[in-house]
Design a protein with these regions (language model features):
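Alpha-helical segments flanking ligand/cofactor-binding loops in enzyme cores
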Residues: 24, 43, 70, 74, ...
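Active-site/ligand-binding-proximal alpha/beta "capping" segment
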Residues: 98, 102, 125-165, 221-225
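Single conserved hydrophobic/aromatic residue that forms the stacking wall/gate
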Residues: 1-6, 10-11
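C-terminal alpha-helical cap/extension of soluble enzyme domains
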Residues: 79-82, 166-254
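Electropositive phosphate-/nucleotide-binding environments in soluble metabolic enzymes
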Residues: 17-20, 28, 39, 63-70, ...
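Flexible, glycine/proline-enriched loop segments at strand-loop-helix junctions
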Residues: 77-84, 120-124, 144-147, 206-211
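Alpha-helix-loop-beta-strand connector modules within alpha/beta enzyme cores
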Residues: 7, 39-63, 90-117, 153-180
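Active-site beta->alpha loop and helix N-cap motifs at the rims of alpha/beta catalytic domains
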Residues: 15-95, 99-104, 122
């Protein structure tokens, strides 16, 4: 049922956000699928993007059994998630899906394992492509509703999309998937590190943040200088008692 609703929405844009401000901006820009973490920003994200489809991450390693995954999944859904992003094993995904929790799974590049594999496309050889595709079919059989396809060749992503019931969410694999996925820090230019080949920086917020930080520092320096030089506080910043009230006070404490 969830897959059918997703297909009818014909959504092409998805982004991962880190703050409620980013979520609000994405929502107002017309992005209808937003992924985020179940952290202290989440309730505000749900508030500022009331009708967006929220895919909320279940951090890898947060749960150690399928039963814990089910419990945590329901907790996140109760908070306002529409689906749970889960990169755990098939057993976890199958258990959650059987309980009716919509799952977004993952195939392809795993960034947090890049120290082992480097940042590279996955599935460029026939053998590796077959492994990725088999993983997709296993996730489909387990009951996942969506699958993020990350940094795989466009030909493989196209074949996967045409041969799975799941909604495919493509990142770094062309325009052949059901949705187009990019991180907000790539779109907004807030990434201080390496920008991958598939990323596109549309604006440069980082440089603006540097300008704002300089303004903050300048403001604090001016405050320090004023205090040292006796220029703050000025008379207009003071609260004073009427002279008769001051005299009355001093008489009372004698």
């Amino acid at each position: 049922t969830w897959c059918l609703v997703g297909s009818e929405m014909c959504i092409r844009d998805r982004t991962h956000i880190d703050t409620a401000k980013e979520a609000e901006a994405a929502y107002k820009a017309g992005i209808e699928i937003i992924s985020c973490e179940p952290d202290h920003h989440f309730k505000d994200v749900r508030k500022v993007a009331p009708t967006a489809f929220l895919s909320v991450g279940l951090k890898h390693g947060l749960v150690s059994s399928p039963q814990e995954a089910i419990k945590k999944g329901f907790e996140i859904m109760e908070m306002g998630a529409d689906a749970i992003y889960c990169s755990h094993s098939i057993n976890f995904i199958e258990a959650m899906a059987k309980e009716g929790i919509p799952i977004t799974a993952h195939v392809g590049l795993v960034p947090n394992l890049s120290t082992w594999t480097n940042f590279r496309a996955v599935g460029k050889t026939a053998e590796e492509a077959l492994k990725v595709y088999q993983n997709v079919k296993d996730l489909e059989s387990a009951g996942a509703a969506c699958v993020e396809v990350e940094v795989v060749p466009v030909e493989l992503a196209d074949y996967i999309t045409k041969n799975t019931r799941m909604i495919t969410m493509g990142m770094g694999c062309g325009d052949v998937c059901d949705t187009q996925y990019l991180f907000c820090n790539d779109i907004l230019g807030t990434n201080k590190g390496h920008y991958p080949r598939h990323a596109k920086k549309y604006v440069d917020i980082l440089s603006k943040e540097d300008e704002l930080q300089k303004i903050r520092i300048d403001g604090f320096k001016m405050f320090v200088d004023d205090v040292k030089n006796g220029q703050y506080p000025e008379d207009k910043h003071l609260i004073k008692m009427e002279e008769k009230e001051l005299d009355n006070f001093l008489n009372k404490i004698k």
